[in-house]
Structures are given as C-alpha cells and as structure tokens.
C-alpha cells in the first residue's frame, strides 16, 4: 500500500536511517550517516486529487536534517543544562541561610494563628490533670499488687513517662497557659511539680529566663552552648559527664542545685542571682513544698521499706529525669544542619526562637501533651498545649524554610531520636568566644570524634 501511494504521489521512499545505538558498541569514526536531500523536487507523475479541484502543488517534504549526530555524552550534558522541556537553563538558587534575619515578624505569625488557639479552658486543663493523676495511681497500685519482676520494668517505663507528663502540665501552669487564674496555676503547679521533686517557682523563673533569651549564646539558661575558653577549662570528668551518654540525661537534679557550667546559683536558694528580690518569697514557698515532699518520701520508706519505695518511686523518677533532659536538649540541638546561636545586636527574640526545633515522639505526643510542638510554644508560651498543633499548622506558611519539619517516628516509640542525641553529643561541643552569629564546633578528642570542625 505504501509503495502504491508513493508511486501515485511521485515520491520515492526515504532511505532507511539506522539510529545510533545508546548501548552496546558505538559506531566507528569512519561510519557515515547520510540523509536524503528532501528539498529537491523529484520528477515523476503529478499528483492529481480525485475529489478536490486543487491546483498543482510541490509535495516535496521540507524536513531539515541534522548536520551530525550528537554523542551520548553530549546529549547528557545538554539534558543537565536544560530543564528538558523548554531549553531554559537552571539557575542555581542561593542556599538558605538559617542565620539570616527572617522576612516576617512576630505580628505576622500571630495574625496567622486562629483566635480560638489563644483561649485557655481551665476545665479542659484540669481534665488532663485528672487523667494523668489517675494513671499514676493506677499504675502504682497495679505494680504493687502484681509485684512481679516481669512487670516492674514495664511499670518503670510507663510511670516515668507519666511523671514527665505531670511535669509538662506543671510547666504549663508556670507559663500561665493552664488558665487565666494565677492562683489556680500556682496551686496546681506546686502540687504537680512538688510531687516529682521539682521546686515550682524556682524552676518556673529560670525557665522564663530560658524563653526570654532563647538562642542567645550567653544569656540562655537551658542547655546553652559553652564558649571555647570555658570548654577548654573543663576537667576531664566534667567533659565526660556533659558529652558522653547517658550522663547528660541525668543532669537535671544537678542543674537544680548548681545550674550549668559557667553559671552560678541554685533553684532552692532565694538569694541566688537567678531571682530578683521580689521573687524570694515565691522561691521559699516552693523550696518548702519540695522539702515536704522529700520528707513524705522518707516516711514512706520507713512504712513500706526502701526497696519497695525505690521500685515504686525511685526508678520512675530516674526515667522522668531522662525524659526531661532528652526532650529539652533535642528541642535546641541535634538537627542535621548546623543552627546558629546569637550574641549582641544579632540576637532578637524572634531569631532566637526560630532556632528551636519541633520533634515527633510517636504516640507519646499525646501522653506528654504535645510538648514536641515546640517552636510555636517558644514564641508564644501562653498558647495552651492542646492548641499547639493547630497553631503550628497555621503558622507554617509564614515560617517558610525557617520551620524544620520533624522526622516522623517510624515506630510507636521515638527510637529515632536516640541516634540524633548521640550524634549531637559527639559533634556539638563549643562555640567561638567571639562573633555575634556562631555555630557549634567539634573537639576531636571527645567521644571518638574524627576532626575539629
């Protein structure tokens, strides 16, 4: 059929062209690919349409032929330089600098958050307290009743996590996000924090300092970076306790009594430089409540025996401390990209808060009241914990690249965070003594680190 058609049209079929293979042996340098000059009119019978009264036309095919066949390497290079559709070259976009001032302000973030996210419901807050207290006493009663060594490890993990949940609710009382009633916040906060041996007002005030100076290389209160000069002056034991797991995860009780390296004072001492004179009565009250709880535990030790007290309260307390240190550390450390710390005029409340990290804890997110949703909490600590997730989703378009999506937990438990905190202990050691925007550097002598960064 094709032969008949070409004869009627006065055309000769094109000579077959064998394409250059993309795999296998390439053509030799002497191989030639010839193309038919299709612009030349071929003599022969004219094409006469049967049903249309059209004038005679030149039916030569006007096809431009390539001068040569590009090599595979050249074609690949061409693909790399173009976007594959319209030949526009890719422009190399500037890398995102997390230390650059953001193109938005706090008012922009606040405006993006729905109004109901700012509403505090004391009844809802109290419902979480009731839930957690019932869980704590229920777990203790079940463990004491069963008194089985197969059960005790499960109890310790669960009860330590519930102690941590109680701490988070007391933490909300300290921020005033529990309710608008300051007296209710103080009473509930004292009951919750004293029960797990935390001085409510002493810790509340130092934690307020942490929020007011978050991301500041010198004035931050919680897990602040060590300047190089101070780092070099630490003795070997102190360095090991600070940077070798699991010791940093047991630091909280020590911090309550002596704060961090380079800082002085105690959360129990009303004359500590942590506090101003008009806060001393609050500190005395909290210290008295803490001492009363300690006395109660000593009395229970005489009643039930020290071993039983250790199993019911002591080990869960240690698990709680590890939760607290793990979470508070990872909210400001351990990201795969280096994040800045600021000094001087480069620091601002917004820029410091944007160095905070959200973390995903799997199904424990609900148990410890979404404390992992931490960026919005740091910028606006008055938002109740039960609105943090919604507020964060609303603010993400404003944050842009300044918000870092947390890695999701592939398992019900956040085991993926263990590797991140260990990696941070091995690399995040000190910052430069000078400069207003600084990043963590690594001492190769610690934890087998291979280099000084």
UniProtKB/Swiss-Prot annotation:
Enzyme Commission designation: 1.14.19.-
Locations listed in the record: Plastid, Chloroplast membrane
Cysteine pairs bridged by disulfides in the record: none
InterPro entries the UniProt entry points to: FA_desaturase_dom (IPR005804), FAS_N (IPR021863), Fatty_acid_desaturase (IPR012171)
Pathway linked to the protein: Lipid metabolism; polyunsaturated fatty acid biosynthesis
Pfam families: DUF3474, FA_desaturase
Higher taxonomy: Eukaryota, Viridiplantae, Streptophyta, Embryophyta, Tracheophyta
Protein name stated in the entry: Omega-3 fatty acid desaturase, chloroplastic
Topology versus the membrane: Peripheral membrane protein
Motif Histidine box-2 per record, residues: 207-211
This protein's encoding gene: FAD7
Coiled-coil residue spans: none
Family listed: Belongs to the fatty acid desaturase type 1 family.
Domains (record comment): The histidine box domains may contain the active site and/or be involved in metal ion binding.
CDD domains tied to this protein: Delta12-FADS-like
Positions of short motif Histidine box-3: 374-378
Motif Histidine box-1 location, chain numbering: 171-175
Source species, domain of life: Eukaryota
GO biological process terms on file: unsaturated fatty acid biosynthetic process
